[in-house]
């Protein structure tokens, strides 16, 4: 009986901690696009600025292809 109560209290505390940290971190990521580009360049082989590209292939490290060149 005591063990069951301890487990229930522990689960309630862990759930409360997760909810508190989720509310605190809401809206704190300021540069989402920059972070996304950084992940893209680290996870795939990408083309550097000035290299030829196609808009449909998304292979530029910067994430943008303008007039056939990575920019």
Swiss-Prot record:
Which Pfam families does this UniProt record tie to the protein?
Conotoxin
Q: Which residues carry this modification: Cysteine amide?
A: 70
Q: Which InterPro entries match?
A: Conotoxin, Conotoxin_omega-typ_CS
Q: State the Gene Ontology terms under molecular function.
A: calcium channel inhibitor activity; toxin activity; transmembrane transporter binding
The record's disulfide annotation reads 46-61, 53-65, 60-70
Q: In which tissues is it expressed?
A: Expressed by the venom duct.
Q: Which residues form the propeptide?
A: 23-45
Would you indicate the residue range of the signal peptide? Answer: 1-22
Annotated GO CC locations: extracellular region; host cell presynaptic membrane
Annotated keywords: Amidation, Calcium channel impairing toxin, Disulfide bond, Ion channel impairing toxin, Knottin, Neurotoxin, Presynaptic neurotoxin, Secreted, Signal, Toxin, Voltage-gated calcium channel impairing toxin
Task: Enumerate the subcellular locations listed in this protein's record, separating them with semicolons.
Answer: Secreted
Q: What is known of its domains?
A: The presence of a 'disulfide through disulfide knot' structurally defines this protein as a knottin. The cysteine framework is VI/VII (C-C-CC-C-C).
Described purpose of this protein according to its UniProt entry: Omega-conotoxins act at presynaptic membranes, they bind and block voltage-gated calcium channels. This toxin blocks N-type calcium channels (Cav2.2/CACNA1B). Shows a weak voltage-dependent reversibility. It is noteworthy that ancillary subunits beta modulate recovery from this toxin block. Cav2.2/CACNA1B expressed with the ancillary subunit CACNB2a (isoform 2a) shows a low recovery from this toxin block, whereas Cav2.2/CACNA1B expressed with CACNB3 does not exhibit recovery at all.
Q: Which family does it belong to?
A: Belongs to the conotoxin O1 superfamily.
What name appears for this protein in its UniProt entry?
Answer: Omega-conotoxin CVIA
Source organism: Conus catus (Cat cone)
């Amino acid at each position: 009986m005591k063990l069951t109560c301890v487990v229930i209290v522990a689960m309630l505390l862990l759930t409360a901690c997760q909810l508190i940290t989720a509310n605190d971190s809401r809206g704190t990521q300021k540069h989402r696009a920059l972070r996304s580009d950084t992940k893209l360049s680290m996870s795939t082989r990408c083309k550097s600025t000035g290299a030829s590209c196609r808009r449909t292939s998304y292979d530029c490290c910067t994430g943008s292809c303008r007039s056939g060149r990575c920019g």
